[in-house]
Amino acid sequence: MNSLGNLENYQKGFNESVVDITEPRIYFGLQTNDTIVTNSKTKKEFDYLSPDGSNVTNEYNGQAGLKLGFFDRMVFAISHGDTKLAFSSDISSESKIIANRNIINRAKAIMPYLVYDENPYLVVSDEGRLVWVLDAYTTSNYYPYSQKITVNNKEINYIRNSVKVLIDAYDGTTKFYITDRTDPIIMAYWKAYKGLFVDLDEKIPEGISKHFVYPEYLYNIQANVLKRYHNVQADVLYRAEDVWEVSTYNLTGNSSNTISQIQPYYTMVKTIDNSQNTLGLVVPYTISGKQNIVSYLVGSYQNGEANLKLYTYPEDSNVLGLMQLDTQIEQNEEIYKQIASLNVSGTKLTKNIVVVPVNNKLLYVEAIYQQYINEENALPILKKIVVASGNKVAIGNDLKEAFSNLVSQNAIGIEIENTEDIEDLIELIIKANNNLEQSSANGDWEMMGKDVEKLQSLVKKLEETYNKEKSKNNDLDITLDNTENKTENEKDKVI
């Protein structure tokens, strides 16, 4: 990567796939919190800098805002505590005041009974206009026989993504579309506030709906609940025997205090049951206390519908976990040297890792950044990329080089081991035996049968693990004996 970060390649990509935007100006967004006055009599609105260095100005022609008569100016001046608005000579009869420009606050002011996603996204309509997509939810804490969770200091046990709010970034036009008619709460709101929602028969324009993604707010809640409730067997749930955790990784690689859970992220995925690449949210899981990845959750938007699917690996699969990848990197002298050379005085290293499903395999991409800690406002600089797939790992200065090394002879083989050792199995056997004693004391014959099967399975697994460890130790003893014999023979030759 050159000093410009290959900007010429990015520019080339933009030129080849031009997005036709007819109105690029954003008056309504996430950071637009101030009330503004447009079309001033004396001051022109700065738009952009022309190639010759002169300022290009703009006049607002949208329908948003109120034209200000003298009485209106007095009212706004009093409400905002600003006398300039009332007596400024810059304001004419063509001037407009535009308020409520923060799109989330704007939606809340219109319909305060919904919960709004904190991560709206901007799309381009077929007409070339910028439109914000804001997901909205109905919630309740009265759903029967359902466990409550706390979200933003509020207890809920019911949530539905029943509304899509579309907000024009230029003129602030706000439309509420009902996307789930099976939700009784939103249908009650529809009957109570019929003028608020778009007609049920009116569909969201395809030029906008084709850009929809799985809502991150809902996904985070579902991914968290799934850690326990992926298993629907009552006895397993009651005993909390099959609890998952979101995979963790080391942010810096040099301190256990920097271990962090991987955050859900949008990426292009190609799952085993879908021939097309799809933009989706992904998070991998491990069994609580273990390191191997056992499953991953994909949230995507396909064929106009939200789709959430869990992909699990067989119990005996050894799928590389994120902490295991870090360990393999540290144990490999060639890769570790390249990373360690970046950790010089006055700098710190940070990492970010994503796991990308490709068919039934996982591709691991780890970016390593260097940042100068003594420089004010110093930005992290991408220095290395580590990629891994299957039992191979490679490193490069950029993504292209890392991938090239992964599929070449430069790739390094890694050993993926199941993290379940003999001590872990003994703990599980003790727990299973306690469960058997409890079900026996309760006279629960069905549960006793399940507990006996579980105990037998664990004992068998312990025996297999023990024999495997014993065989490995025997091989090591043979190797050491051969080494000692070879050394003695060499001594005899010298004598």
Model-derived features with residue positions:
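Soluble extracytoplasmic regions of secretory-pathway and membrane proteins
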Residues: 1-442, 446-469, 473-484, 490-492
